[in-house]
Amino acid sequence: YVWDRNYSETRLPEVPSAILEMLSHQSFPDMRIAQDPLGKFYIARSIYKTILRFVNSNHGTRYVVQPLAPQNFSVTQNGGVALLSWSAQLDKTEPSARPTSYIIYKAEGQGGFDNGTIVNTTRCQMQLEPGKLYHFKVAAVNAGGESFTTETLSVLYNPAASKSVLIVNNFHRLASPQVVDDEEKQGFDFDQDPGVSYGLTAGWSGKQQVFDRSRMGNETSFGLGFSGNEMIGKFVAGNDFNYVQAHATSIAASGKYNISSCSSEVIASGRVQMQNYQAVDLINGLERHDGYTHAFFKSFTPELQNRIRQYASQGGRILISGSYNGSDMQTEEEQAFLSDILKLSYEPTGSTVIARDINPEDSTVTERDSIVCTSPNVKGLGLQFSYYNELNAQHYAATHPEILKPVGNYAFTAMQYDTGTSAAVAYKSTTYRSFVMGFPLECIIDESTRTSVLLGILKFLTD
């Protein structure tokens, strides 16, 4: 441990240094900021700006602040030519952070990213080699440095393909563990929602065990905020912003489709039209409106709902996977979207339903209460498989998969948890088709199984 060590860097004058008292661990509002990945970023960027201004002002030189990551990223292809498009994200508090150029990083197939190509505009065309899968990400640049990169997007030109798939990334969420803050309880509830870190993170000693506000100030194992130590030294995978790449790799294995991809932002704005594609693969991941994160995240924003409605009315074929496709849609209008367009209803885990047991000898029926639940094991499409459902260092976990039930004619359960509850709902009519999963497809542990599942769903949607 280093928390109780004698920090010579802050005592000896050889190296200029300082301890910044930004937040108090005894202030819950402060800790909400400290646990929020976006809060950590804002604090770090503020410190960076302060040091930059201090050093440059001492030397009488002009400073330029590093830009923010580009947004509204899309990579679409037409006839073997890829069009990359994005927009600058401006820092409203710092005029000098405006980007002057961009770096496009490219990877081919299973290879790593190159050292990047500098461009001066927010659009770029590239010739694609037939049959080769490409992955791209973009960073903004100015005299102050280079930004974080965008999410990773993928593109594939297959001359023999008659159908094109658009992969849409809607998993942008970053969040602390579930905030509990009422008259009786206070803290972070890992079991309710472990949150979403930015990439791989080792940030916790253990789960909070005591939430009783009446025990505030008690410095014992019974005091408010007391936590375990089971997570000391353990890394937890978060949002890597590269799940389009995983989906594209599976789709490319079929050799049957062209692939384009984009962020959900450009779908909502209409810059990329879903109706130009024979199928859409929407990645929702752990996206949801949690009610405590400062930034707004949502599985289906009103704008995205409208685009999906339009796509369905024009004969669209859409796959949607994620952990909160049902629970994140609670208003009357949102539930109408689920039932009218996606042909499903959400059943909370732990709900009590009436089960009917039939006696095979005399056919008598006995009714009993049964509690519905999910499991990490799923069967469907002729396969049995497992997905990441516990925190680990390899891949983000779907700790709260959902039960999605079919609604109306032509909708049916396409996957089941081994508890017998519905894990996915498929809908096939003469107008449009949909396939909605109660857990993220990219969380399927075995890669070959994940590919088989995704290609099986695309076959259902497009054949």
How would you label these PLM feature ranges?
Residues 53-96, 130, 145-162:
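Pro/Thr/Ser/Gly-rich low-complexity, intrinsically disordered linker/stalk tracts
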Residues 352-446:
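Catalytic beta-strand/loop cores that center a nucleophilic Ser/Cys/Thr
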Residues 152-278, 283-286, 455-463:
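Aromatic-Pro/Gly-enriched surface loop or interdomain linker
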